[in-house]
Amino acid sequence: MTKALYLDCHAGIAGDMLLSALVDLGANPEDIESELKKLPLDQFKLHFQKRVKQGIHAMTLNIDVKEANHHRHVNDIFKMIDDSTLPERVKYRSKKIFEIIGQAEAKIHGMSFEEVHFHEVGAMDSIIDIIGGCIALEQLGINTLYCSAIPTGHGKINIAHGIYPIPAPATAEILKGIPIAHFDVQSELTTPTGAAFAKGLVSSFGPFPSATIQHIGYGAGSKDFDFPNILRVIQFESEFEQQDSVQVIECQIDDMTPEALGYFMNNALEQGALDAYYTPIFMKKSRPSTQLTLICKLHDKTYFEQLILQETSSLGVRSTSVNRKTLNRAFKILSTQHGTVSIKFGLQNGKIMKMKPEYEDLKKIAKTTKQPFQVIHNEVLQQLYQTYHIGNILQ
């Protein structure tokens, strides 16, 4: 079995709501604050207390901070994390969340990732929310996260660059490929930080899976509505393979260039397709052609059918709903002589069935060390199989 967490975002998600919910779930607030104070931050104090939100007792967070620097560069935050003594998985998860926000800001403002200067996200409270949340997840031993569809609210919000519609530009960019739930509330329900947590750490989105519930935590948002403005987190033991249905969309193409086909596949995957691939086939008149197969969530069927009709030369598509069974996924960080590598595990009843290092981490190490990719891959794989063993329970 593996410890997993379900984020029930019926009222949206924000960094402070998640951290509060994790403390309500059982994370130790004193230990979180102690770990955070190992970072070179201005003086601060965390205050967690219970508050009633429309009849629901939920945890809230207030941060007392004496801050001199509201705006930090992305490299400053990364260096602060890298130089710390935080656990490796906390470092990895924290940097991944900051990277997602930074990439979104870079795209919106038309600059490189290195040029991004964090505003709200660079402020102390957001740094505490992100890194503190990752510390809490580590305390609780959470390996895998799942999440409901996420509501954003609607209306307008005043941000650093002026008045913008909800969701804010960064939030909308981060939520690409994530299912959005409609909730008719004129207010911001999901922040960039909350969206980045979901984008970076959640394995899959949808209803609560078949599982044994262990603990439940409630984190309260700062706003008051006529409904409980809370994030509910549910810790459970994931015992079996995940079973669900997906949509398979196909078409045949005989008049597109390889460049155009490559562009479509990259675009579809960026938009949230679960998978896409091409198969060489022969069509009528003995023409060598290509069959496009795209796999997506059931609720994304209409969107990707339209994308295929819009972006390819095909005049039609075929769609089929199919059942699939997948192993439970979990991630751990492996420390190597070259740096840290994220390891993906496939679990069945808590036992390791598959394990492999993440390609992007290996690629980054190969580029940094200027060693052949295969050399790095083999070294990491050797250490991986010395550390973990197929058939053992993942601890």
Swiss-Prot record:
Its EC number is 4.99.1.12. Belongs to the LarC family. It comes from the Bacteria. The keyword Iron does not apply. Keywords: Lyase, Nickel. It catalyses: Ni(II)-pyridinium-3,5-bisthiocarboxylate mononucleotide = pyridinium-3,5-bisthiocarboxylate mononucleotide + Ni(2+). This is Pyridinium-3,5-bisthiocarboxylic acid mononucleotide nickel insertion protein. Involved in the biosynthesis of a nickel-pincer cofactor ((SCS)Ni(II) pincer complex). Binds Ni(2+), and functions in nickel delivery to pyridinium-3,5-bisthiocarboxylic acid mononucleotide (P2TMN), to form the mature cofactor. Is thus probably required for the activation of nickel-pincer cofactor-dependent enzymes. It holds the Pfam family Ni_insertion. The keyword RNA-binding does not apply. GO terms for biological process: protein maturation. InterPro entries: Ni_insertion. It is an enzyme of class 4 (lyase). GO terms for molecular function: lyase activity; nickel cation binding. It comes from Staphylococcus epidermidis (strain ATCC 12228 / FDA PCI 1200).
